[in-house]
Design a protein with these regions (language model features):
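Short acidic-hydrophobic surface loop/beta-edge motif
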Residues: 10-16
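Conserved catalytic cores of soluble enzyme domains
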Residues: 65-185
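Short, small-residue-biased leader/transition segments that mark boundaries at the very start
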Residues: 1-5
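A structural preference for short, pocket-lining loop segments at secondary-structure junctions
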Residues: 16-25, 42-67
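Redox-cofactor binding/interface segments in oxidoreductases and associated redox assembly factors
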Residues: 33, 59, 120
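Glycine/charged-rich beta-loop-alpha catalytic/anionic-binding loops adjacent to active sites
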Residues: 25-32, 61-66, 90-94
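Glycine-rich anion/phosphate-binding loops
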Residues: 6-7, 33-48
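Flexible beta-alpha connector loops of hexameric P-loop NTPases
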Residues: 31-38, 69-73
């Protein structure tokens, strides 16, 4: 596992309660989970794997956004990953994102933000620009609510479908996938 921590994103294929799945997980400890060219390619490869094997895709996001030291190459990953997810959706395969703490920047504004089901972990920070950036933009005359950009606030405003504690994610995701796959069978 030592080498695992030298990567921004991991891709896995396996089974969840008997259902074949493809899964991605971002590593925030690697350059703040920032997405660059290699990470974009990994996300696209995971989507292609899900399409080729007809599996749901589950992504665990945890990122500060795009990798600024890669400049426009990092920013290009936003539309590239969105296009890949749209291909997944054309195949009518379930796409679930679990927003871990934090999920901000280009990740929340691109591939993580267009899931079929959006699950947040309790008290996770979820948003585009960070609290300090927004506060400096609006000036000191206005203050942001205490729960600004928390999973609870994001749920209240309709951007999350549910908040689930990590210990309950496996069973929740399994149930959601089974429901979504049953709905696809009927259509």
């Amino acid at each position: 596992l030592g080498d695992v921590y030298k990567r921004q994103i991991l891709i896995a294929q396996g089974k969840l309660d008997g259902v074949n799945i493809t899964c991605t997980a971002q590593n925030f400890d690697f350059i703040g989970g920032s997405v660059g060219a290699a990470s974009g390619e990994a996300i696209i490869a995971a989507v292609q794997n899900a399409i080729n094997n007809k599996t749901p895709l589950i992504s665990f996001s945890s990122s500060g956004g795009q990798r600024m030291m890669e400049a426009s190459i990092a920013l290009m990953q936003m539309p590239r990953t969105i296009i890949a997810i749209k291909e997944l959706k054309k195949e009518r395969l379930p796409y679930i994102v679990v927003f871990c703490n934090p999920t901000t920047g280009g990740v929340s504004a691109s591939w993580a933000g267009i899931s079929d089901i959006a699950i947040g972990e309790p008290k996770s920070t979820i948003g585009f620009a960070g609290r300090r950036v927004i506060e400096s933009t609006i000036g000191s005359t206005e203050s942001l609510p205490e729960n600004f950009q928390t999973a609870e606030s994001v749920l209240k405003h309709g951007r999350l479908d549910m908040i689930v504690e990590r210990k309950n994610l496996r069973s929740t995701i399994s149930n959601v996938i089974k429901i979504l796959l049953k709905l696809e069978e009927k259509n």
